[in-house]
């Protein structure tokens, strides 16, 4: 099976779609070139982080309860690294419907020339798998963004610097992924604080994102923070951000290689932080090496009326704010005809994205994997996951 070549890009892999409207097809072609090389290897950096924002009732579906959401990042990373058929230390939290996107990420990862690197930030439990420790476990989760003082400024500066060092050390094309329950709400706060119109553009893991609750928490946090009219990215992070955003923005600023951002609004917030930290003349340079990759379920979601789905509108708003064109693509994987009900739940608006699933699936397609084979791989992986769950109960 051969990777996609540049001559094929006029017709993207089956089902893949362009996200946003500010990036020309020629620009998109340039963005895709490093990800279509069949003889290339890539780096995957998965950042796990925690914020007390996730403990607000109804804010996130990345775990059915606040207690279970404290383990979501560890459980998802465990599944990504070890797969569904092997014993894992961290059980997956119960979900309202569907299955963890880490399962999809694992299936794609098995078909790609990359080794994952995991970093843990502010988790309440120590990871039992190999990982980068970028700060002491005693640092704990970020405070709820509604406090207006989510992190101490010293912590933000320290994490940003560590992200910059990490970004400078990684040399191959980099896929950046995250698992941060509550992270779409901190993303909404960061984007709004940095001047990006976000009303009706931020999704979440729930089938019906709690828009009013998110808006209330964001307004409460920004009111209490009393930020100046043109705050620095670091000041915004200290007020309403989370540890993932600080490290990821630092990585993005210092990385000189192509970067594939795996996700939706959380990665849009990271791109916004990075762009806001740079002088005007350097912003286009950064935008030209960044591509956002998402799932079709997130990229095609309409939250408000408009000319295009919410994620595309959000990318365009970020680009307009900083005078650049941000490129985005959605993977072509769909589960309409899957034999697995938990996978078909994705088509009904549950889960949608996470743990870099969209970017990993997109990269697998760009490297020549057919969507039918990826669907079958996800179905087999879910068979294994369900069988292992039954075995553990016996």
From Swiss-Prot:
Single GO MF descriptor: nicotinate-nucleotide-dimethylbenzimidazole phosphoribosyltransferase activity
Tell me the domain of life.
Bacteria
Which InterPro entries does the UniProt entry name for this protein? Nict_dMeBzImd_PRibTrfase, Nict_dMeBzImd_PRibTrfase_arc, Nict_dMeBzImd_PRibTrfase_sf
Q: Which family does it belong to?
A: Belongs to the UPF0284 family.
Instruction: Identify the NCBIfam families for this entry.
Output: PRK04447.1-2
Q: What is this protein called?
A: UPF0284 protein SYNW1869
